A protein has these predicted regions:
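A short Gly-Trp-Pro
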Residues: 30, 39-45, 49-73, 79-158
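Bacterial Sec-dependent N-terminal signal peptides
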Residues: 1-23
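Short N-terminal segments immediately surrounding and downstream of signal-peptide cleavage
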Residues: 23-39
């Protein structure tokens, strides 16, 4: 019984630390700025979400209920990320898309924070945190790119 307790304790420690062991290597991005430059460019909320991987509160974001035609760009570098054509009502309180505008413009990496494993979505040009992607979206992809409004800017179609 003592051995079983020891094995369970050891397994618990390994499981708890596994998030750190699985973190991705630091990436180099085309657009790089100092922390001070990011703070100067972004609002405090944008900085917290885009650069420190925060999350805006559900149903508070500017684009959660946006139904205008256009495209969504990265707040950090203006890279085109999503289109209103793939936006859908997910009921989550965040703008949701079933596909990026161009696959290579978003980067998906494992996020092992908060005691769970999720797929984080980042801008492939500047590394800004955009949100997460889940496998519960509509056809044709079955994906739900759940984005933070503060990580995006909207360009209305002409």
């Amino acid at each position: 019984m003592k051995n079983l307790f020891g094995v369970l304790a050891f397994a618990s420690i390994i499981f708890a630390c596994s998030g750190y062991a699985q973190q991705d290597k630091p990436r180099k991005f085309e657009v790089t700025k100092t922390d001070m430059e990011w703070r100067k460019q972004l609002t405090p909320e944008q900085y917290t979400v885009a650069r420190q991987k925060g999350t805006e509160r559900a149903f508070t974001g500017e684009y959660a209920d946006n139904h205008e035609k256009g495209k969504y760009q990265c707040i950090g570098c203006k890279l085109d990320l999503f289109s209103s054509e793939t936006k859908f009502e997910s009921g989550t309180g965040w703008p949701s898309f079933y596909a990026p505008l161009v696959d290579k413009n978003v980067l998906v990496a494992t996020d092992n924070t908060h005691g769970m494993s999720r797929d984080e979505v980042m801008c492939s040009r500047c590394g800004s945190h955009l949100g997460h992607v889940f496998d519960d979206g509509p056809k044709p992809t079955g994906k739900r790119f759940c984005m933070n409004s503060v990580s995006l800017s909207f360009v209305k179609a002409k």
